[in-house]
């Protein structure tokens, strides 16, 4: 069976031009124009998808099969090209019958051309083949356009579904163009509207808890760039004005012992007029023990020093993936559960914006894992948000799972985050010592997001940072009142 790609090559039909026209028409459709205006960040993501569309269309045209009737007509045309004019005259009746039997668009015109000329000349032979070729090119082009139109409708339907999904989730998960691009890539899965509405629901809850959202942003930014002085700095002259004490008599600051006659206290001056005390006065004058007023002032002078020219390189601290462990015990149900899920959604938003990974582990009596930043991130997020917190608390297993994950090179420089109320039994000594070793040797950082004010200090002491979000009724009312 002849393929459409082979037919295009034989007839020199330019499929690239047809593909480009179809893509331009798709991007100019009213549905996409409205969407681009409403969500400009996603426009770049969709535009970046165009090469994939182009390649898919090429593959579709390459694998498409030509109808048997057209295949037979093309074969007949190729054989006719090899005939000389006398041979063509002999084969002409069979050619006309074949065209009629195949319902070729060229059949009627071919018969009219032959009937209009009583003699078949070499020029008529050439004209017949040229017009037949034009008819085949038109048929091949029409077939290409039909297939591309089918693909356009299918592609437009797919894009509209993804636009609906991305448009709903863009305000929740896309903080910049990078996040918008990753969100668009994730939207390729088969999702129903009721599924992703769960993400919308928790996104709205997160907006109602700005303190929780701000806490997630602070945790995400906890690794800031550090400035490091250069070692090859040159020396430069630095001038500054310094203030220092002076003897300029500006104000009385107290009393002192000295030989300053001009600032003698009246009682000291009185002893000079008493004969019996005159020698005592001179002795104290020589020894600078007379009581005098202490006057002080201040003066400014220019100080010149040499110091290195300060040039600093900013060492951007690596922001690795998030490994988030969520306590799903019964005490974490209700409002705590909503806050924990919304906090993970906020970390997912940060991970998408900063091109980081976000890995979720639910721990109770068993551990369930989700990766929210992978190609199936939206589906994974929906499955995570659908979980209910009704298990027990096994914090030790949580830490062991984190430490096992940190052994892999792909999780180098990860931030481990544990979300819990930390109302649990103390950690085993081997777990505590291993965590401290990871902190000391590999500089891994462990964050605690405490959902209760009653967490055990002995457990929380192991963390590098403790982010508190009290979910008690009093704290909730205070937060609402402050807004």
Curated annotation (Swiss-Prot):
Keywords: Chaperone, Cytoplasm. It holds the Pfam family VWA_CoxE. Its main location: cytoplasm. It is found in: Cytoplasm. CDD domains: VWA_YIEM_type (cd01462). One of its GO terms (cellular component) is cytosol. PANTHER family: PROTEIN VIAA. Belongs to the ViaA family. HAMAP family: ViaA (MF_01626). Homodimer. Interacts with RavA. Component of the RavA-ViaA chaperone complex, which may act on the membrane to optimize the function of some of the respiratory chains. ViaA stimulates the ATPase activity of RavA. NCBIfam families: PRK10997.1. This is Regulatory protein ViaA. It comes from Escherichia coli O7:K1 (strain IAI39 / ExPEC). The lineage of its organism: Bacteria, Pseudomonadati, Pseudomonadota, Gammaproteobacteria, Enterobacterales.
């Amino acid at each position: 069976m002849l393929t459409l790609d082979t037919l295009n090559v034989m007839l020199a039909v330019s499929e690239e031009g047809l593909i480009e026209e179809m893509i331009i028409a798709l991007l100019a459709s009213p549905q996409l124009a409205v969407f681009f205006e409403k969500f400009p960040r996603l426009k770049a993501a969709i535009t970046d998808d165009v090469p994939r569309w182009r390649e898919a269309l090429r593959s579709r045209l390459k694998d498409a099969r030509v109808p048997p009737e057209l295949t037979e007509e093309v074969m007949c045309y190729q054989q006719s090209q090899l005939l000389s004019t006398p041979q063509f005259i002999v084969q002409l009746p069979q050619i006309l019958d074949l065209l009629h039997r195949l319902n070729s668009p060229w059949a009627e015109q071919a018969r009219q051309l032959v009937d209009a000329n009583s003699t078949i000349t070499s020029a008529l032979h050439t004209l017949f083949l040229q017009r037949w070729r034009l008819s085949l090119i038109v048929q091949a082009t029409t077939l290409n356009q039909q297939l591309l139109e089918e693909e356009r409708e299918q592609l437009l339907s797919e894009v509209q579904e993804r636009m609906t999904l991305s448009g709903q989730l863009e305000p929740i998960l896309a903080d910049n163009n990078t996040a918008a691009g990753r969100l668009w890539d994730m939207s390729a899965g088969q999702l129903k509207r009721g599924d992703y509405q769960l993400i919308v629901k928790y996104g709205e809850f997160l907006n109602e808890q700005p303190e929780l959202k701000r806490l997630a942003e602070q945790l995400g930014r906890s690794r800031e760039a550090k400035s490091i002085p250069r070692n090859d700095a040159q020396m430069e002259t630095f001038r500054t004005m310094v203030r220092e004490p002076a003897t300029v008599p500006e104000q009385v600051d107290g009393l002192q012992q000295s030989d300053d006659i001009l600032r003698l206290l009246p009682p000291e001056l009185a002893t000079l007029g008493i004969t019996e005390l005159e020698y005592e006065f001179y002795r104290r004058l020589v020894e600078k023990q007379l009581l005098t007023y202490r006057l002080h002032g201040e003066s400014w002078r220019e100080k010149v020093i040499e110091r290195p020219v300060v040039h600093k390189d900013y060492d951007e601290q690596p922001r690795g993936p998030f490994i988030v462990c969520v306590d799903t015990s019964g005490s974490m149900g209700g409002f705590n559960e909503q806050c924990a899920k919304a906090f993970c959604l906020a970390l997912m938003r940060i991970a998408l914006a900063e091109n980081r990974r976000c890995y979720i582990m639910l721990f109770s009596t068993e551990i369930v894992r989700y990766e929210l930043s992978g190609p199936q991130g939206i589906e994974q997020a929906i499955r995570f948000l659908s979980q209910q917190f009704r298990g027990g608390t096994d914090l030790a297993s949580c830490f062991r799972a984190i430490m096992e994950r940190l052994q892999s090179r792909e999780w180098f420089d990860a931030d481990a985050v544990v979300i819990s109320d930390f109302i649990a039994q103390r950690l085993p000594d081997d777990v505590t010592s291993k965590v401290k070793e990871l902190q000391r040797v590999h500089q891994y950082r462990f964050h605690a997001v405490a959902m209760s004010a009653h967490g055990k200090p002995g457990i929380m002491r192991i963390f590098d940072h403790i982010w508190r979000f009290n979910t008690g009724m009093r704290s909730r009312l205070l937060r609402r009142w402050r807004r």
